[in-house]
Amino acid sequence: MTDLLVKNCLLSKNKDPQDILIKEGVIKDIASKITSDNLPTIDADFHFVTPPFVDSHFHMDATLSYGLPRVNKSGTLLEGIKLWGELKPNLTADAIKERALKFCKWAVARGTLAIRSHVDVSGQNLVGVEALLDVRETMKDFIDIQLVAFPQDGLLRANCLDNLNTALDMGIDVVG
């Protein structure tokens, strides 16, 4: 875990600059003039420090797929769902993982600490589940990822309930 001292931070609740002491990845103290000899130190140079962002509803299995298989010309949800149905049979775990990792790195670099992502479990296979479980493991030191089994085509479709249960057995967190 990370030990760090961040000096000269502007916070929303304090008029004067504050220092932030982080031990084992957890904020242990916020005060003016914290001293520590052996910690890596960052000077925030009187910039504003905010809590991290949380993305509470995302579809990481579809991230960065603009134009695949074609552009959603109407911009509507219905056309987007239709396009997803066209793309889904051609998805691979590697392609989903590559795009999701790229997105996660982008999100972390911009201050996101947690993502709740839906993953479609209504296809013939669970490539999205497989890929996003890998992504969650790969990124666990940088971002918290909660995975939601999402039966896009409905629970009553063939094999969907079985897929849902299998996804939960594989490590998906919740259903939604």
Segments predicted by a language model, with ranges:
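N-terminal metal-binding scaffold of metallo-dependent hydrolase/deaminase domains
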Residues: 1-36
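Short loop/turn motifs at secondary-structure junctions
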Residues: 5, 16, 108-111, 171
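Active-site gating loops and adjacent loop-to-helix segments of metal-dependent hydrolytic enzymes
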Residues: 64-96, 171-174
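Metal-coordinating catalytic core of metallo-dependent amide/deamination hydrolases
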Residues: 90, 117-176
